[in-house]
UniProtKB/Swiss-Prot annotation:
Disulfide bonds join C58-C129, C85-C103. The modification Phosphotyrosine is found at Y201. GO terms for cellular component: external side of plasma membrane; plasma membrane; protein complex involved in cell adhesion. It is found in: Cell membrane. Residues 134-139 are annotated as: Important for interaction with CD80 and CD86. The gene is Ctla4. Residues 36-145 form the Ig-like V-type domain. Residues 46-50, 150-155 are annotated as: Homodimerization. SUPFAM superfamilies: Immunoglobulin (SSF48726). Keywords: Adaptive immunity, Cell membrane, Disulfide bond, Glycoprotein, Immunity, Immunoglobulin domain, Membrane, Phosphoprotein, Signal, Transmembrane, Transmembrane helix. This is Cytotoxic T-lymphocyte protein 4. Glycans are attached at N108, N113, N145. It comes from the Eukaryota. The lineage of its organism: Eukaryota, Metazoa, Chordata, Craniata, Vertebrata.
């Protein structure tokens, strides 16, 4: 019995010695989550184009060699955060938002250039960029201070069909006006020529020249 108790005591002593490397490894993996973070910078103000397109860079530092990055764009409304678009990518040049067709971007080292399309005036607000370095460990996360995006709706353009009808109406009006002016001018010209000719050709006999007067010579007799 004494030997059995001694063996159990030795096993209990050896169990912590075998598990402590795993505990240390997990500690090293999860300590950076709470102790280290990345700094994310983004412009403070961006004005969207007349087509509702806004682009802004999202840069994080310090730079870490990572194979998998997750970028999330959040919109802050009062005290609430709404996810606009998010993606996880591993390529070095393109950032694909498969579930968000109105978002696109490019990646270059530690800089992500984001583009949001289809914005309207009601979408004006503060947009925050969140960056997560997923793989390889350790895990890093950071969020920017936000970019205020201003969107101005363009003035509504007139209907193209309406403009086409206006152009056709003006063209027809000018055509009939020129036709009327030409008809009036031709009528006046014909009225001026009517007293001079009846418009019927009549063959006239040739006129004979007036005969010269013949004088009888007057002789004066001389005795």
């Amino acid at each position: 019995m004494a030997c059995l108790g001694l063996r159990r005591y030795k096993a209990q002593l050896q169990l912590p010695s075998r598990t402590w490397p795993f505990v240390a490894l997990l500690t090293l993996l999860f300590i950076p989550v709470f102790s280290e973070a990345i700094q994310v910078t983004q412009p403070s103000v961006v004005l969207a184009s007349s087509h509702g397109v806004a682009s802004f860079p999202c840069e994080y530092s310090p730079s870490h060699n990572t194979d998998e990055v997750r970028v999330t764009v959040l919109r802050q409304t009062n005290d609430q955060m709404t996810e606009v678009c998010a993606t996880t990518f591993t390529e070095k040049n393109t950032v694909g938002f498969l579930d968000y067709p109105f978002c696109s971007g490019t990646f270059n080292e530690s800089r992500v250039n984001l583009t949001i399309q289809g914005l309207r005036a009601v979408d004006t607000g503060l947009y925050l960029c969140k960056v997560e370095l997923m793989y390889p460990p350790p895990y890093f996360v950071g969020m920017g201070n936000g970019t205020q995006i201003y969107v101005i709706d363009p003035e509504p353009c007139p209907d193209s069909d309406f403009l086409l009808w206006i152009l056709v109406a003006v063209s027809l009006g000018l055509f009939f006006y020129s036709f009327l002016v030409s008809a009036v001018s031709l009528s006046k010209m014909l009225k001026k020529r009517s007293p001079l000719t009846t418009g019927v050709y009549v063959k006239m006999p040739p006129t004979e020249p007036e005969c010269e007067k013949q004088f009888q010579p007057y002789f004066i007799p001389i005795n």
